[in-house]
């Protein structure tokens, strides 16, 4: 009550912020007459002037009004577009590091030019993040004209571009790219072995377009760079043959082998199912011993493969969750309907789906580097974003990213009419109504956009429309390449476009069709008459569509998130245009079936509803919204939980990547190596000669043997211990340290300082990367089983933090030991020695080849028909020549001349 009274008196926080920013808009507008009078050269000279003022200590906020006024005037001259006042407010919100919620068609791309220009003046780089490569290249090309005119450089990054081009793009004042590309390049940079191999500068400022899609919808999917693991994929194929023989239960208590938890996207074997699965696996020879049981320790890998196969068959559907293209399983984004080429599900799920579809099963991958979008974007010094739908997720943006959402008013009032939902008993009745609505719109010349939640539904609707003779376009993952063309024509009179979810998001649907696309098709050499004719035709179509009611949106199912539904609705009614929307639902829809209250379904059946009967009731709409809120809260908990765990990994990642940066930047890592060597020697001696112990507890011979095997240092300590009466552990440690230091000094003297420094750096980076890779695998295993600790009355998150710290400490110790072992055992040769060894190897290879020829002939001599063998081979016997040795014979126990350090008999002298 009090809050509502205060809001009425003082306005909401959003209104108060808008009032403050409106004062700045007044200042910018006051500067406009002065800025308009500047010549092109004078306007362009403002950029270096602003840079000088910033260098002199002036703040960005101080020059904001003038910089925004300059950018607005430059945009008017170069692009023919002048920023509205509400767009200036949007630009200020982005500059302040907040999220600007702006309705579809309000010109978010143009809004971004204001804060991008202002922040690029600092020269530290601005990243503009888009949801796909098409939008990144389009926006970089269109807005790049403005930035270049103002004296700023623009780059765009995309997969597969040459290394030098990508470095140049990241070195630009402004860089466009997708969230995936920025993330993967960050990981690649932290796997590079030299500064020259890195792309990115410090993460300074990012503006994320469609920020809700990237920071919320994709937050559950970590970016992973991986390499193939050693395990064969054969077991996935064998287990895949078992799963179709198991039967699905209708409920957890029903009869069958397994039941599906659709909320959690998991499959669980029943008691009977475990026994049946064991029996089938034994028959297939996958389980070896019937007495051990499916859940014995040695069969855990089989359980992992079986769970993956069950999920692949029972939960993941073709043309809904993935498509099969060119013999590969390609994931379909559940939020946008776009294909995610190059991405793979983890935990063996992708391999299980490949086995199910009968395409080649690729090896499981081992993680080399990974990061979540949550932790990637939180590393930017300043982060902001823009979208048409953020207010429903304002709490999550604030709590996880520290980003406040500011709702920007529209330039013109929205006149779209949102009709109430229509609820049917089953899918058949629902789709009959959808088809009737589409046909009605097509007859009246009203364009209609139909949003579906799967490729399967879009193709089913397409088939019905084809039979009814209704011309239409389908926009889903299978028509990804034609996306821009289809969206450009979606506003034509009577056009029918079926789209999966938000495919085509980022491109406006203009009533009457895209005038820009028609101009582009004419070419630059088109006459004024031709352009005038096109403009006249477009205006006629535009007016006809407005008269028919504008763009009509049909939703065939409610999404789990209200935000996705709002995005679909937001495609209509842009810039004050007319439009309408309606959602058609059925009790068989996933949201209604899984999350809506049972009483809704019972009530509709008790009322004797038939297939084509419809309900339009606020009570039902409230229940649907309640179900959506439940799912949103559930998904938020999942993302928050993921972040809690990844924060542990992130702290460790920061330590490792900071260490790598130090190594890459250092001219020499000798001091690091010396320090590590001291630690390793101390630990090594302490294993055999514990501190503060008596000599009866010492294992001196063990220490000598370990020094020889691990460090290549021969040192006699036994005599010293026997002959010296008063000797302690510290003296032994000092003796060992001196011997190892001398061993390293000897190596350095032999090869020179420069070579040794380069080797030390290379070994430290390589061992650190290998250790981190193995540590990530251990962390994955720890994460997968950590929830079992809950059964022991322990907090899984606390246990994870504790054990992750122990694993990390262990990894760092292992890295230290491995660095010293490698540097101690490595043998570096001069160029002359390498050339000599290569010549020796050539001679040895030639001798082995001749020996094998002689052996073959000798063996042939013992055959029953030597002449027949010669006729079949087509060769006469080779003359046996005397082989003379230029060098002393290499004994089988001598070191191999190749320099491997192995005995000759275990290297190039192995018996075949």
Curated annotation (Swiss-Prot):
- Gene3D superfamilies cross-referenced by the UniProt entry: Helical scaffold and wing domains of SecA, P-loop containing nucleotide triphosphate hydrolases, SecA, preprotein cross-linking domain
Please identify the protein, giving its name as recorded. Protein translocase subunit SecA
* MF annotations from Gene Ontology: ATP binding; metal ion binding; protein-exporting ATPase activity
Give the function comment from the record: Part of the Sec protein translocase complex. Interacts with the SecYEG preprotein conducting channel. Has a central role in coupling the hydrolysis of ATP to the transfer of proteins into and across the cell membrane, serving both as a receptor for the preprotein-SecB complex and as an ATP-driven molecular motor driving the stepwise translocation of polypeptide chains across the membrane.
Q: How is the cofactor bound?
A: May bind 1 zinc ion per subunit.
Instruction: Please report the record's description of how this protein sits within the membrane.
Output: Peripheral membrane protein
State its Enzyme Commission number(s). Answer: 7.4.2.8
Gene designation: secA
Q: Which organism is it from?
A: Xanthomonas oryzae pv. oryzae (strain PXO99A)
Cofactor entry? Zn(2+)
């Amino acid at each position: 009550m009090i809050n509502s009274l205060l809001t009425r008196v003082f306005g909401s926080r959003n209104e108060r912020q808008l009032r403050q920013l409106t004062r700045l808009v007044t200042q910018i507008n006051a500067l406009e007459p002065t800025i308009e009078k500047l010549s092109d050269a004078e306007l362009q000279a403002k950029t270096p002037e602003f840079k000088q003022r910033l260098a002199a200590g002036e703040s960005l906020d101080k020059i904001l009004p003038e910089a925004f006024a300059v950018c607005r005037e430059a945009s008017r001259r170069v692009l023919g577009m002048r920023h509205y006042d509400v767009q200036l407010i949007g630009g200020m919100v982005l500059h302040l590091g907040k999220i600007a919620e702006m309705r579809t068609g309000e010109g978010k791309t143009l809004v971004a030019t204001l804060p991008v220009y202002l922040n690029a003046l600092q020269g530290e780089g601005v990243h503009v993040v888009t949801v796909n490569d098409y939008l990144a290249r389009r926006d970089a090309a269109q807005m790049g004209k403005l930035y270049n005119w103002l004296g700023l450089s623009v780059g765009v990054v995309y997969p597969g571009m040459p290394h030098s081009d990508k470095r140049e793009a990241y070195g630009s004042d402004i860089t466009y790219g997708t969230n995936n590309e920025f993330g993967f390049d960050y990981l690649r940079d932290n796997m590079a072995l030299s500064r020259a191999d890195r792309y990115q500068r410090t993460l300074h400022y990012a503006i994320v377009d469609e920020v809700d899609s990237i920071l919320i919808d994709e937050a559950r999917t970590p970016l992973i760079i991986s390499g193939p693991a050693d395990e064969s994929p054969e077991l996935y194929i064998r287990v895949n043959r078992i799963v179709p023989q198991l039967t699905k239960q209708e409920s957890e208590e029903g009869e069958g082998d397994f039941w599906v938890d659709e909320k959690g996207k998991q499959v669980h074997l029943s008691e009977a199912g475990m026994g049946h699965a064991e029996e089938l696996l034994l028959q297939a020879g996958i389980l070896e011993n019937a007495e051990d049981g499916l859940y014995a320790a040695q069969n855990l890998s089989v359980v992992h493969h079986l769970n993956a196969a069950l999920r692949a068959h029972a939960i993941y559907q073709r043309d809904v969750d993935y498509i099969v293209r060119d013999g590969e399983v390609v994931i379909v984004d559940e939020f946008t309907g776009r294909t995610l080429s190059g991405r793979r599900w983890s935990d063996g799920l992708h391999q299980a789906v490949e086995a199910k579809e009968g395409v080649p099963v690729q090896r499981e991958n081992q993680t080399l580097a990974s990061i979540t979008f949550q932790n990637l974007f939180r590393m930017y010094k300043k982060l902001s974003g823009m979208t048409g739908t953020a207010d429903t997720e304002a709490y999550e943006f604030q709590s996880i990213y520290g980003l406040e959402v500011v709702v920007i008013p529209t330039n013109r009032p929205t006149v779209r009419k949102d009709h109430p939902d229509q609820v049917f008993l089953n899918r058949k009745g629902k789709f009959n109504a959808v088809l009737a609505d589409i046909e009605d719109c097509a007859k009246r010349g009203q364009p209609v956009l139909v949003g579906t939640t799967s490729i399967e539904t879009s193709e089913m609707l397409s088939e019905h429309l084809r039979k009814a003779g209704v011309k239409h376009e389908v926009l889903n993952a299978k028509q990804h390449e034609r996306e821009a063309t289809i969206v450009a024509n979606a506003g034509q009179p009577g056009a029918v476009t079926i789209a999966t979810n938000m495919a085509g998001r980022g491109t406006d649907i203009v009533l009457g069709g895209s005038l820009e696309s028609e101009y582009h098709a004419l070419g630059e050499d088109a006459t004024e008459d031709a352009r005038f004719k096109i403009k006249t035709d477009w205006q006629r179509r535009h007016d006809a569509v407005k008269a028919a009611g504008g763009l009509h949106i049909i939703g065939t199912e409610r999404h789990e998130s209200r935000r996705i539904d709002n995005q679909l609705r937001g495609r209509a009614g842009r810039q004050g245009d007319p439009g309408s929307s309606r959602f058609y639902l059925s009790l068989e829809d996933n949201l209604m079936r899984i999350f809506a209250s049972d009483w809704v379904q019972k009530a509709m059946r008790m009322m004797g509803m038939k297939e084509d009967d419809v309900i339009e009731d606020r009570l039902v709409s409230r229940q649907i919204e309640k179900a959506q809120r439940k799912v949103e809260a559930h998904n938020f908990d999942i993302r928050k939980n993921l972040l809690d765990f990844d924060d542990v990994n992130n702290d460790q990642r920061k330590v490792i990547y900071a260490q790598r940066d130090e190594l890459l930047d250092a001219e020499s890592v000798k001091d690091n190596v010396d320090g590590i060597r001291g630690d390793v020697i101390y630990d090594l001696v302490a294993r055999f000669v514990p501190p503060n112990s008596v000599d009866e507890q010492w294992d001196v011979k063990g220490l000598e043997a370990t020094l020889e095997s691990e460090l290549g240092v021969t040192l006699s300590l036994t005599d010293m211990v026997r002959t010296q009466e008063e000797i302690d552990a510290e003296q032994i440690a000092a003796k060992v340290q001196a011997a190892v230091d001398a061993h390293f000094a000897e190596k350095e003297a032999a090869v020179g300082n420069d070579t040794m420094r380069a080797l030390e750096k290379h070994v430290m980076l390589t061992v650190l990367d290998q250790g981190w890779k193995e540590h990530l695998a251990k962390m994955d295993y720890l994460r997968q089983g950590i929830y079992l600790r809950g059964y022991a009355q322990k907090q899984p998150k606390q246990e994870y933090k504790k054990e992750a710290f122990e694993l990390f400490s262990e990894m760092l110790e292992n890295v230290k030991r491995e660095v010293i072992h490698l540097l101690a055992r490595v043998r570096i040769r001069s160029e002359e020695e390498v050339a000599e060894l290569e010549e020796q190897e050539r001679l040895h290879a030639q001798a082995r080849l001749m020996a094998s020829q002689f052996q073959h002939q000798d063996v042939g001599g013992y055959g029953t028909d030597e002449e027949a063998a010669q006729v079949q081979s087509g060769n006469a016997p080779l003359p046996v020549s005397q082989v003379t040795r230029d060098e002393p014979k290499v004994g089988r126990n001598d070191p191999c001349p190749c320099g491997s350090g192995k005995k000759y008999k275990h290297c190039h002298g192995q018996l075949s």
